[in-house]
Curated annotation (Swiss-Prot):
Compartment list: Mitochondrion
Gene name in the database record: NIFU4
Keyword annotations: Mitochondrion, Transit peptide
The protein's name in its UniProt record: NifU-like protein 4, mitochondrial
Chief place of localization: mitochondrion
GO molecular function: iron ion binding; iron-sulfur cluster binding; structural molecule activity
Organism: Arabidopsis thaliana
Length: 283
């Protein structure tokens, strides 16, 4: 009904306009056609109302359509509205299922072996062309190889995500496995390390996660002043990751923590075998 009301309103506005350089014949014709349109609209609406009053078939049809839609969505749960978002890395894409993914922290799966502990990550890895999977709070970042098009991968990833959420399976087979609290401040941390972790958690990590990735704190060498970090998700392998690391993260850490002299990136090649449960981090 709102659409019809807008249509009638727009027609009224058009009919009420005066044409300065027109003739009376044109104005009369426009008014006549407008009245005819209104009359036809009124007759059509009246006939529709009468048919609803005399025959209950139309309401029954509407109810059955709503029931089928409700059963389709609520019973089988086979329909999801999944959104995608590009990242600075052209090989990575963020998928938003409209449902929470990680309740706490994030999880990175740099290889197939690391994805064996997660049914969703394992399912996505079974798609040809997928080389990395990352879980955020409400998104899944998928990284592909250069020789595969997103036009081919996206429908398969959509299906994998939809099948997972309709299956009722847990995100992880073992929720306690590999829960590395990399930025959690412990009693053994020095004041410098505590400041580094706080900056990573409150200032740097949120910005990196907006681009579909994350960072992992790997350590700090007090003698050299070097902070070691590992880029994850879309940030891993991104052409601009080195610029982000140096111009963004390094400058911020050096500005707020005088003991920091530089930042170095750790690469996944050093841990190629991975772990059965993935690199899951609890924040």
């Amino acid at each position: 009904m709102k659409g019809i009301a807008r249509l009638v309103t727009s027609l009224s506005r058009i009919g009420g306009r005066k044409v300065v350089s027109g003739t009376s014949t044109v104005t009369s014709s426009s008014s006549s056609s407008l009245l005819l349109s209104r009359r036809s609209l009124f007759i059509s609406a009246t006939n529709l109302l009468n048919s609803r009053t005399k025959d209950s078939a139309l309401p029954s049809l509407n109810s059955s359509l709503l029931a089928q839609k409700w059963n389709f969505l609520g019973g089988q749960r086979r329909t999801m509205f999944i959104q995608t978002q590009s990242t600075p890395n052209p090989s990575s894409l963020m998928f938003y299922p409209g449902k929470p993914v990680m309740e706490v922290g994030s999880a990175d799966f740099p290889n197939v072996r690391s994805a064996l502990g997660s049914p969703l990550a394992k399912s996505i890895y079974s798609i040809d062309g997928v080389v990395r999977v990352f879980f955020g709070s409400d998104f899944v970042t998928v990284t592909k190889s250069d020789d595969v098009s997103w036009d081919i991968l996206k429908p398969e990833i959509f299906a994998a995500v939809m099948d997972f959420y309709s299956s009722g399976q847990p995100l992880f087979l073992d929720s306690q496995a590999a829960a590395a609290k990399d930025t959690a401040i412990s009693e053994d941390d020095s004041e410098t390390v505590a400041m580094i972790k706080e900056l990573l958690e409150t200032r740097i990590r949120p910005a990196v996660q907006d681009d579909g990735g994350d960072i992992e704190y790997c350590g700090f060498d007090p003698e050299s002043g070097i902070v070691k970090l590992r880029m994850q998700g879309a940030c891993s392998g991104c052409p601009s990751s080195s610029v982000t690391l140096k111009s963004g993260i390094e400058n911020m850490l050096m500005h707020y923590v005088s003991e920091v002299k530089g930042v170095e990136q750790e690469f996944d090649g050093e841990d190629e075998e991975g772990t059965l449960s993935g690199e899951m981090r609890v924040e």
